[in-house]
Amino acid sequence: MLSGRLAQAARAAGISAVVVPMDGFHLANTELQRLGTAERKGAPDTFDVDGFVNLLQRIRAQATATVWAPVFHREVEESFAAELAIKAHHRLVIVEGIHLLHTAHGWERVFPLLDVAWYLECLDVDQQRARLVQRHIAHGRTPKQAHVWVNTVDMANMERIAATKHRAHTIFELATW
């Protein structure tokens, strides 16, 4: 992922950096099933946005303590708490996720907590769709299930995300993904 490469480059330049993905704040599958939203996992309202905002506030206010964050594991489609350590010495915190610019469901509280926001736009939607299908297949879905998921859930997310790109400080257009 680009966020990991940016953190690696920063560290190579002597800047302590950490990547904080919003994916750790996916609601648990059992909770998504209880809420009836499991079939749309990844939509803005299927995350613990309050927990994510709280994490960002804690990081910004951090003086000396370590702030712990959950990490999402795609191979089991669940998050594990307190797996990522954000330390006070981290000078660069790269926050990564698809809903950082969203303006509803509580996500509007995220943008003011970011010093800068970049939007990465893949100009080849067919390539992006194909990569998403392959990712879903690699994590256990059948090709048919992967295509259905991408054409319903993922494409709806992509449209929702694209509608907020104007909020980004910089938009990077990527010819290939």
Regions found by a protein language model. Give the residues of each.
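Short glycine-/polar-rich loops that comprise or flank the Walker A/P-loop
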Residues: I15, P112-V116, H166-H169
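Conserved nucleotide-sensing/catalytic segment adjacent to the nucleotide-binding pocket
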Residues: V18-P21, L27-V76
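Helical mechanochemical/support elements of P-loop NTPase systems and associated helical scaffolds
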Residues: D45-D48, Q128, N157
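Short helix-capping segments at alpha-helix termini
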Residues: A10-I15, H139-R141
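Small-molecule kinase domains that catalyze NTP-dependent phosphoryl transfer to phosphate-bearing small molecules
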Residues: A82, H105-E108, Q134-W177
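ATP-dependent NMP and nucleoside kinases share a basic, alpha-helical "lid"
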Residues: V76-R135
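Conserved catalytic segments around the Walker B and adjacent sensor/switch elements
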Residues: A13-P21, Y119
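Glycine-rich phosphate-binding P-loop
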Residues: M1-Q8
